[in-house]
């Protein structure tokens, strides 16, 4: 089994593309194939000690799911399945996609929901990201003036995505026991 599991939920395909891009940076022994949570199981997630979780923010700052017209469901339906998973021995890195121009009052809020979910179950979250260079009003994904994970805005700052991903992957690599 690979050392790192990568799970995501995507409505438009952007989060899926980022998850697959991250996977391509690692061999199969290091990282499993990126998997949409609507095809995952709690047992599969529980089997990894290192996780990368990705989400977009939909609706009024919500996790992707059936209530936000995410075909096949998403984090909204999957998180209840994870409620009994012990995250206390897990290292988790988060990434979130959002649109700071169109939704400045709920920018990447869904990533904040994922963060609070895994922390409440004992996870160690790594890969906090500076909030500089983003223009938004409020976000549930901010803790101590930093984002709880990597934030990407594919609508307004797509040109910064590759550099941000490279820097973030270097940031989390040692936390996952990987070379930088």
Model segments located where?
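N-terminal beta1-alpha1 ligand-phosphate binding loop
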Residues: 2-26
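A short beta-strand-loop structural module common to alpha/beta enzyme folds
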Residues: 29-41, 129
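Structural motif
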Residues: 42-46
């Amino acid at each position: 089994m690979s050392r790192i599991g990568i799970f995501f939920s995507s409505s438009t395909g952007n989060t899926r593309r980022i998850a697959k891009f991250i996977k391509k940076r690692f061999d199969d022994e290091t990282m499993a194939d990126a998997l949409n949570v609507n095809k995952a199981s709690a047992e599969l997630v529980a089997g990894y000690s290192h996780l990368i979780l990705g989400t977009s923010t939909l609706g009024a700052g919500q996790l992707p799911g059936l209530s936000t017209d995410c075909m096949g469901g998403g984090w909204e339906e999957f998180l209840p399945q994870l409620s009994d998973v012990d995250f206390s021995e897990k290292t988790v890195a988060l990434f979130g996609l959002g649109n700071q121009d169109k939704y400045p009052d709920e920018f990447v809020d869904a990533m904040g929901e994922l963060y609070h979910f895994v922390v409440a179950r004992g996870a160690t979250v790594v890969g906090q990201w500076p909030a500089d260079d983003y223009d938004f009003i409020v976000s549930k994904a901010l803790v101590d003036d930093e984002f709880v994970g990597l934030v990407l805005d594919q609508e307004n700052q797509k040109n910064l995505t590759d550099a941000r991903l490279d820097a973030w992957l270097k940031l989390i690599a040692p936390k996952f026991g990987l070379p930088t």
